[in-house]
Amino acid sequence: MRVADFHFDLPESLIARHPLAERRASRLLQLDGPSGALRHGQFTDLLEQLRPGDLMVFNNTRVIPARLFGQKASGGRLEVLVERVLDQHRVLAHVRSSKSPKPGSQILIEGGGEAEMVARHDALFELRFAEPVLPLLERVGHMPLPPYIDRPDDEADRERYQTVYAEKAGAVAAPTAGLHFDDELLAAIRAKGVETAFVTLHVGAGTFQPVRVERIEDHHMHSEWLEVSQEVVDAVAACRARGGRVVAVGTTSVRSLETAAQSSELKPFSGDTDIFIYPGRPFHVVDALVTNFHLPESTLLMLVSAFAGYAETMAAYRAAVEQGYRFFSYGDAMFITRNPAARGPEV
């Protein structure tokens, strides 16, 4: 399959650069995978699509204010984007600077703080901070907005680029399908008899990296840490036993569950995943999906195409553009039921 098969034209005006006033105010495009039928509505219509006995699986990762500004001891300016917290004082990070810092060099952090460049690991730099890193980031860090939101972060992003159920710090990008849920909607979902469970996948900056090969089979995914607990495994088993559906909120929840079920049986899992889901790959756990609209030629669009079918997905995206849906992290959402006969692009 060619990466170019997953291209679509998107007007700049449809890229959402700010969140709506209310989380639940987004629109919802419903795609019935088996038939390809589309239905336009509001995000709160999701409640009508859920059934008593269903299980919704959310990603409870918490976005850290991972972007830092500072300067080298020589005075040169630089920007640090933390990719992964290794321990209380060490991180792996991307560093943007006219000249890369050398091992042993000091970095002075804007707002107060200091780090030492310890080593380079391919494109990432290992930094050691003088003080505990998570409190430092909370104090002087900036929210790591995606590159297509071309504006400085503001105070509102600290709340809105974060799900209301975020718990475990470590992501440098939000699991954006979850941004549409507020406490009231979650309560209404539970009141309907829908169960909830939480996985953790710390979303990395690699989620925004373009696919740089022509054939998608040649692409290698970035690695991210995730955890699927025994509690989640038991919740899925109970859902199956009562005839319910597993509804994943976001592609990160899909990747978590399907990683933990690569042997066809869902088992507890804790560790790194580089799972790449594209058309032709079977799904072992997820029956329905809540997801935002993704970038052209992105691995996430390929995942959705694997779930709903290539032709059905691309038709839905064309309809979304025609109807003026808002795209990407702060944009609108889709609710998709899995197409068991999903096919990739025609060769």
Curated annotation (Swiss-Prot):
Q: What class of enzyme is it?
A: transferase
What top-level branch of life does the organism fall under?
Bacteria
A GO term (biological process) for this protein? tRNA wobble guanine modification
For this record, an example GO cellular component is:
cytoplasm
How does it associate, per the subunit comment? Monomer.
What the protein does comes down to: Transfers and isomerizes the ribose moiety from AdoMet to the 7-aminomethyl group of 7-deazaguanine (preQ1-tRNA) to give epoxyqueuosine (oQ-tRNA).
Q: What is this protein called?
A: S-adenosylmethionine:tRNA ribosyltransferase-isomerase
Which organism is the protein's source?
Ectopseudomonas mendocina (strain ymp) (Pseudomonas mendocina)
